[in-house]
């Protein structure tokens, strides 16, 4: 029985996941892991965000675990930048607190409280010039 090919990093798995979900044209969610990193990610072809707007091609990330030896070295910021490139119109990050919350706000994310899901969402919206801005 042939072995399933293992993709060596969460970043490459993310690219493959988003490209595959976009090609299928339906929403998907999964958990990715490699070398101790874990990420829950979702792709939605269409998603209304309360008090912000309606978006196409949304990437949402949550429940991220970074191994201790890689923390405070910029891995998460780089991962957010990668996900922003993969998203068509919006990138959503769920439940960020402390220094991470402050960093996202400095990067232009807008904080939205989702009462239905009882969580904080941080939304970065792409403009036609492919930059992130506040709505």
What are these regions (language model features)?
Residues 110-125:
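Conserved catalytic-core motifs of GNAT/GCN5-like acyltransferases
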Residues 62-71:
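A short, internal acetyl-CoA/4′-phosphopantetheine-binding micro-motif in the GNAT/acyltransferase core
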Residues 16-63:
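Conserved acyl-donor/pantetheine-binding loop and adjacent beta-alpha core of acyl/acetyltransferases
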